[in-house]
């Protein structure tokens, strides 16, 4: 049997890769440039980036989902462990690629104020994992944040929540690291992907095709004319 990560690697070529990553790309872009709630010491970001090459070069490829539970609440603890087991089973069945860390934190750890565990997700299967956790989290809260060299910003203003949010302890997070904190390079996904990358010309052609289709959709907003 072909390993599931090999199957996923074969999906990320050409148009299929473009479509499959669209959800993660849009969420990254929104979180990066139009964060809805800012800490008091931050200011609104500058004008959103529209240069195609710059946007592609800065695209986030890996994410963390942190599932929270009150460590003294037996029902929440059990629900969190059942969700973790379900993710592992579905990964084994090929539903998506998601890698829970071996450790479950039974006490506050790092920035996380309650019991928690981490799930690493590459951009190639972000939409599938996000969908599954939205539908199956029950009453658990889930912190979603990108993995970049700016760990503080990733947790502070680039984060998102599925369910009620928790206050994070950001005091010891580094402002900027020398390297991107990529994980599980053996899977060849996320930042470690070796899949074919579409050229700018291929992307613009695909974009033109999509615009042509959407001209028949009355509710779809029209894109402005492309700069020369």
Swiss-Prot record:
Compartment(s): Cytoplasm
Expression (tissue specificity): Expressed at high level in coloured cap tissue and at least 10 times lower level in the stipe.
Pathway field: Pigment biosynthesis; betalain biosynthesis
GO molecular function annotation: dioxygenase activity
Entry keyword set: Cytoplasm, Dioxygenase, Oxidoreductase
Domain of life, source organism: Eukaryota
Coiled coil: none
GO CC terms, sorted: cytoplasm
Alphabetized Pfam families for the sequence: DOPA_dioxygen
Keyword Cytoplasm belongs to the record: yes
The EC number(s) this enzyme carries: 1.14.99.-
Disulfide bonds, paired cysteine numbers: none
Keyword Cell cycle listed: no
Record note on quaternary structure: Homodimer.
Free-text function comment from the UniProt entry: Extradiol dioxygenase that opens up the cyclic ring of DOPA between carbons 4 and 5 thus producing an unstable seco-DOPA that rearranges non-enzymatically to betalamic acid. Can also catalyze the formation of muscaflavin (a pigment found in the hygrocybe mushrooms family and of some amanita species only) by a 2,3-extradiol cleavage of DOPA.
Protein name: DOPA 4,5-dioxygenase
């Amino acid at each position: 049997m072909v390993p599931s990560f090999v199957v996923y690697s074969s999906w990320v070529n050409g148009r299929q890769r473009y479509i499959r990553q669209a959800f993660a790309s849009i969420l990254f872009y929104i979180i990066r440039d139009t964060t809805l709630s800012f800490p008091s010491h931050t200011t609104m970001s500058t004008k959103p980036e529209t240069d195609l090459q710059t946007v592609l070069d800065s695209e986030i490829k890996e994410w963390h989902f942190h599932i929270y539970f009150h460590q003294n609440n037996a029902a929440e603890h059990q629900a969190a462990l059942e969700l973790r087991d379900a993710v592992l089973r579905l990964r084994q069945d090929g539903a998506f690629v998601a890698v829970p860390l071996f450790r479950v934190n039974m006490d506050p750890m790092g920035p996380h104020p309650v019991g928690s565990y981490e799930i690493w997700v590459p951009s190639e299967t972000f939409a599938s994992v996000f969908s599954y956790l939205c539908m199956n989290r029950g009453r658990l809260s889930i912190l979603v944040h990108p993995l970049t060299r700016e760990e503080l910003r990733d947790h502070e203003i680039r984060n998102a929540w599925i369910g009620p949010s928790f206050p994070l302890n950001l005091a010891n997070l580094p402002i900027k690291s020398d390297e991107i904190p990529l994980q599980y390079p053996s899977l060849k996904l996320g930042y470690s992907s070796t899949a074919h990358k579409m050229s700018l010309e291929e992307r613009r052609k695909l974009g033109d095709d999509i615009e042509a289709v959407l001209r028949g959709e009355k509710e779809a907003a029209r894109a402005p004319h492309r700069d020369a």
